Amino acid sequence: MPLLEGYGMTETCGPVCVSLPENNRIGTIGMPMSGVTAGIADDGELCVRGHLVCRGYHNHPDVTAEQIVDGWLHTGDLGDIDEDGFISITGRKKDLIITAGGKNVSPGLLEAAVMTSPVVNQCLVIGDRKPFVAALVTLDLADANAWLKSQGAQEESDLASLARNPIVHTEVERAVNQANEGVSRAESIRKFEILPDEFTQDNGMLTASLKTRRAQIVAHHRELIDTVIYVPKKK
């Protein structure tokens, strides 16, 4: 069954970009619809304007002034427009990581690439104001054990044991290296840690819509991040 991507927001009263059966490119959201213009701001944010963009936010003129500038709606999404006009979404602006070296890194693409591994459940890329990019990885007990069995290896009884398993570590490393092939060296994951637990709603690491709560995860694993991943330099 053919599946085609599109893009829209509440603020655009429906879709602003669509992929057509006769004109599409895998990995993109297609081209702007008739009457819609799209552009990429200096910070990488996708902006759109046209008759579909709402007039503003009811009773919130301050938000309207911030989000809609000279008719351009700032979507909050990071994106690219290729030479043929096809648009790709690369992440969320609020999730953007800026390393200590000033490199802007969109974590979403890296995270998605790492999570293609059959053993990985979740991945959180970190590195804001840090010297390099790193990742926190969680495992799926059932899927990881199924993969171990397919490799002729012994299954593990819990996530903590899985996290210490050298075969699993090698598989996660493979996934990280593969993810790094799609980005520059400055954007690549230099270190990763496999966690002995998962991000869940119960432990406050996921929202009700199952999105990762980045700030909470970083705060919870602060000691690991500051003493293991980013080892302080000896004075």
Where are these regions (language model features)?
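Gly/Ser/Thr-rich phosphate-binding loop
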Residues: 1-24, 37, 121
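Adenylate-forming
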Residues: 5-12, 51, 53, 58, 68, 86-115, 135, 144-166, ...
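Ser/Thr-glycine-rich phosphate-binding loops at phosphate-binding pockets of nucleotides
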Residues: 9-12, 75, 99-100, 207
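Conserved ATP-binding/catalytic segment of the ANL
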Residues: 32-99, 116
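C-terminal boundary motif of the adenylate-forming
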Residues: 78, 117-143
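C-terminal module of multi-pass small-molecule transporters
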Residues: 108-112, 125, 177
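Conserved C-terminal "lid"/linker of ANL adenylate-forming enzymes
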Residues: 122-124, 131, 173-235
